[in-house]
């Protein structure tokens, strides 16, 4: 699954987040890299225990919970608290695959990474390079937009040669573990929503909605 989700943040929310991030205490991103990733990672991150990380992370989670497209596509059960990175002056992150399981700082909880997400804070014209490359697809979205993709995908961030690229990134444990099943549910949900707009009184809506929930019941893992 790979899906672009527009307008997770509106213009006012984006401006507030950008202002806070530009004054952030950025640290060497290699401090959070694993044994293999440390050799291919060259960026900056906010510390996970930085109050700004926690404040903006909570804000993003609240926005996502109110975004119907994200909820329908990800079917989130648990979300790793959002983190924040900055790429500038040649900053890059070579080919890697995300960890399968993440610990939640300060808790005994672990979260399986089914989906990876990047929320962009910089407009594409503000920097050169910096594309997120997932498999063979190059992604550079407008600020406030989010890309959602399978955590098992090989991906990288191309070197930033001008300007700076600010983003948030996090991982989702979905109610539905398998990408193929999640894609079927999203396609079915899209069809239900379209039918509701076209023929809101159709009895088929009840039937299709029942099929959706029965499939979700069959495939859900909690």
Curated annotation (Swiss-Prot):
Its cofactor is Fe(2+); L-ascorbate. 2-oxoglutarate binds at residue 165. It holds the Pfam family 2OG-FeII_Oxy_3. Binds 1 Fe(2+) ion per subunit. Residues 78-174 form the Fe2OG dioxygenase domain. It is an enzyme of class 1 (oxidoreductase). Gene3D superfamilies: q2cbj1_9rhob like domain (2.60.120.620), Rabenosyn, Rab binding domain (4.10.860.20). This is PKHD-type hydroxylase Pmen_0803. It comes from Ectopseudomonas mendocina (strain ymp).
